[in-house]
């Protein structure tokens, strides 16, 4: 399907959550962060969050999209405001690329990317989300482009150490519709 006339494009920064009810393309750039996409195939609405960390100890503070659990809660609230339920959405997970693999090998700590991946998968399980695709882990960064008019999510993954022309051959569409 061609890009509809009047399509809006939104670029998410780390910690942002966006939800749209009209033809929209959502974009973001991920390293160790993770993006969760929600797409409602009947209503052609949905959203994306770009979280940075698995969670925080918070008490009586506003929700903050920088944290996995809170970013998902914000998406769930958008779904509810639009008269839909989480079970009606196709959900996809992206990111969690290890950005400093050599450093990680020398230190006995876990990297943020792995913690983010585990948080995303645990939240998907806890909320019984309908996961249709995921592209997480490895090294390097990913450019994500999510088209709400058809649910396609395009991923360009640039692993650490790959030549630029090799990375372009790895472009893929995370269909799963």
Curated annotation (Swiss-Prot):
The keyword tRNA processing does not apply. It catalyses: L-glutaminyl-[protein] + H2O = L-glutamyl-[protein] + NH4(+). InterPro entries: CheD-like_sf (IPR038592), Chemorcpt_Glu_NH3ase_CheD (IPR005659), Cytotoxic_necrot_fac-like_cat (IPR011324). Its EC number is 3.5.1.44. GO terms for molecular function: protein-glutamine glutaminase activity. It comes from the Bacteria. One of its GO terms (biological process) is chemotaxis. SUPFAM superfamilies: CNF1/YfiH-like putative cysteine hydrolases. The keyword Hydrolase applies. Keywords: Chemotaxis, Hydrolase. Belongs to the CheD family. This is Probable chemoreceptor glutamine deamidase CheD. It comes from Pseudomonas fluorescens (strain SBW25).
